[in-house]
Amino acid sequence: MNAPASPAASPSQRARKPDWIRVKAPTSPGYAETRKLMRELNLHTVCEEAACPNIGECWTKKHATVMILGDTCTRACAFCNVKTGMPRPVDLLEPEHTAIAAAKMGLSHIVITSVDRDDLPDGGASQFVKVINALRRETPQTTIEILTPDFRNKPESAVAAIVDARPDVYNHNLETVPRLYPTIRPGARYYASLRLLESVKRRDPSIFTKSGIMLGLGEERMEVHQVMDDMRSADIDFMTMGQYLQPTPKHAKVIDFVTPQAFDAYAQIARAKGFLQVASSPLTRSSYHAGDDFEHMRAAREAQLARVRAD
């Protein structure tokens, strides 16, 4: 994992996926029903837009990560398959449609993410608030996890407004190690993302915070360990690690396919550093098994508090 990251690769250079990263094409009735509902409500999902390898499994179970604020991002990260350009105006019906979808699917846990909207004064924070409020009204039993952009160069009040809307989990991904930011995530700043997550916990310590990185981009083992330490310094509760997969030949190429055993080893180290929850495998993505992971994290916090009270 010492090779430098390359910004792109030709089709002939694209590495062949090992067996452990291969998944079956989605064909189930549950998948078709989820897809139909999203179309009817004019909702976008990161599952489709980012070409997630787990879409078949998740949609079969009627789990979907709704991507608000449209399907066009104002940035062009080297790893991401979401299209870039000038976005359309914000859909005023999106909050209500998202809540209707959650209710119809009977979701116990929902993940809401978005494209970057650098064109909006608050980066789209107010739309997150509206979606959270609509979900609370329509399906109050559903726990809410949000995965936000970094709101770079936006007022601090943008993130504060989302925190005050009380999502159950606030996720913002660091994506990769600091050294690779100039080529992999050039529109963002590593320490700014850490500060965002710190600010969430500082404003409302009861909200679970979560972040993740991709592996296979040329990062070194000790760099991954340092990211873990940085996350714990920011009091992040949940860390995810998954294999980067090159969406198209225009995107950053895969430097190596990290073995399942290496992912397990990283998970052991992360748990030893004090995270309440760790998800680490080749197919791990931010919202993969998010509902189950939330329950495990909540139970881990309760056990932790019980130990403190006992002492």
Curated annotation (Swiss-Prot):
Pathway: Protein modification; protein lipoylation via endogenous pathway; protein N(6)-(lipoyl)lysine from octanoyl-[acyl-carrier-protein]: step 2/2. The keyword 4Fe-4S applies. [4Fe-4S] cluster 2 binds at residues 73, 77, 80. It is an enzyme of class 2 (transferase). Gene3D superfamilies: Aldolase class I. PANTHER family: LIPOYL SYNTHASE (PTHR10949), LIPOYL SYNTHASE, MITOCHONDRIAL (PTHR10949:SF0). This is Lipoyl synthase.
